[in-house]
């Protein structure tokens, strides 16, 4: 089920013309989350929702996921919990690579987060992000 934003009716008031429908576009910034009851606009924004947004007539060929504090691990070492978000998003990217969801490569690149105030442990976190994101994370 596709979740609608709290301002869905407002967003639907105007259609914007697609100016260059053949122009390949990479969406450089989006987030994915679920069950975020504190979110002001939309408590859920996952693959179904982003596909609905990007399949609007533009030629969105890929997207870049930016960390947003979602899907962190609840257990294990505190400094490694953010790696859960990379693992989750890498799964979304793998779904898109299958081709079942269309041609757009959602989360073709992932920007994760590391608390750099943890000193030498930051290197371990970066290594774990690289392992979890396979080829999608670059340092």
Which residues fall in each region the model found?
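Acidic, His- and aromatic-enriched active-site or binding-groove loops in soluble protein domains
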Residues: 132-135
């Amino acid at each position: 089920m596709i979740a609608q934003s709290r301002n869905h009716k407002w967003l639907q008031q105007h259609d914007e013309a697609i100016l260059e429908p053949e122009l390949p576009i990479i969406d450089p910034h989006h987030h994915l989350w679920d069950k975020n009851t504190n979110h002001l606009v939309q408590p859920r924004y996952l693959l179904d929702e982003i596909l609905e947004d990007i399949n609007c007539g533009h030629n969105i060929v890929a997207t870049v996921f930016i960390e947003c504090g979602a899907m962190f691990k609840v257990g294990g070492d505190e400094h490694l919990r953010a790696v859960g978000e990379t693992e989750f998003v890498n799964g979304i990217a793998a779904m898109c690579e299958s081709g079942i969801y269309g041609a757009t490569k959602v989360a073709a690149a992932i920007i994760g987060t590391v608390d750099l105030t943890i000193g030498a442990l930051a290197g371990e976190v970066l290594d774990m992000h690289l392992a979890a994101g396979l080829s999608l994370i670059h340092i």
